[in-house]
Amino acid sequence: MKYTPLHKIHQQLGAKLVDFAGFEMPVQYDGILVEHKAVREAVGLFDVSHMGEFEVKGKGAKAFLQNMTTNDVESLCDGKAQYSLLLYEDGGVVDDLLVYKIADEHYFLIVNASNIEKDFDWLKQHQPDDEVVLENRSDELSLIAIQGPKAEAVLSKLTDVPLDAIKYYHFVFGDVCGKRTLISRTGYTGEAGFELCMANEHAEEIWHALIEAGLPFGIVPVGLGARDTLRLEMGYSLYGHEIDHQTNPYEAQLGWITKLQKGDFIGKNACVEKKLHLEQTLVGFTLTGKNIPRQGYKIQDLSGTDIGVVCSGTLSPTLGKPIGTGYVKSSFSKIDSKVYINIRGKLQEAAVVKVPFLHKNR
């Protein structure tokens, strides 16, 4: 089992700890509903140090990432980030990731914890030459997310960086508690907030300082349970649920980060083909009853014929009703289409709805 540099803090806080991607991580502290509400209404603090960090630099780094990822690396300016995908040749998803441009031919990637080794191996397999340097920095860096409408007010107590000047999906390097930190206006909750990346040895100090500065604002530590309900309300994909090696970006409603016009990239031909012949599509749905849809449950039509499968589901703390995502035959993907979730042998009526389930301003 692996541990993040903040593991002792989670133990001291009495967090319920679970195995996630080989890390012992907090799934909740005071409860998923309390933590979810705090992020939507005030501010929450997340340890996401289990995520992976890679550095890509050297002559040819831009061209390398342009070939490896679906989004247009050429469009990045210094200090800007983009959401993107790594694909296999058949269009299946290796992983989703964030690509940060630090400087010309110098990039920083954040990948999913469950895919660190796989992703790094995939990049190494396609490394063009020794001029492009790939470095896996996952074991030396920590990642803390501060999210919610009061996140900026809290973080501003600990840094001289003008946070209001950092636009959405932009970042700067600056001092937090006097320690060099990558400060990025990004997140996985739909709320305003920042993700902070720092050397492991500074993580505890920064965490404690954020908690102390956040007490007047109602800050709470937030576990992976609420992280999941928050992301699901926004319709954000989670690797292993909405996307995996068998899903194509166009099926997963990720055509907006798949830039077919940019030139060649791994998986492009499969994406071109899939865009023309979409047999299944990822949709969001709400249920009329109280039962919660779970990953793997069948989605059926009224006659009981299989038309798809559930990817994720939860009782939305904000909406107060069950929501979910799933793949359905494209003919059932229109908004307001009636579908049925087979929950323990009983068909529960659901309606396809527009995603995100919530509309937030960041």
Swiss-Prot record:
Subunit structure: The glycine cleavage system is composed of four proteins: P, T, L and H.
Keyword line: Aminotransferase, Transferase
CC annotations in GO: cytosol; glycine cleavage complex
Annotated GO biological process: glycine decarboxylation via glycine cleavage system
UniProt cross-references to InterPro entries, sorted A to Z: GCS_T, GCS_T_bac, GCST_C, GCV_T_N, GcvT/YgfZ/DmdA, GcvT/YgfZ_C, TrmE/GcvT_dom1
One of the Pfam families matching this protein, by short name: GCV_T_C
Family statement: Belongs to the GcvT family.
EC class name: transferase
Record-given protein name: Aminomethyltransferase
Function of the protein: The glycine cleavage system catalyzes the degradation of glycine.
PANTHER family to which the protein is assigned, alphabetical: AMINOMETHYLTRANSFERASE, AMINOMETHYLTRANSFERASE, MITOCHONDRIAL
Organism: Chloroherpeton thalassium (strain ATCC 35110 / GB-78)
Reactions the enzyme catalyzes: N(6)-[(R)-S(8)-aminomethyldihydrolipoyl]-L-lysyl-[protein] + (6S)-5,6,7,8-tetrahydrofolate = N(6)-[(R)-dihydrolipoyl]-L-lysyl-[protein] + (6R)-5,10-methylene-5,6,7,8-tetrahydrofolate + NH4(+)
Example of a GO MF term: aminomethyltransferase activity
EC number from the UniProt entry: 2.1.2.10
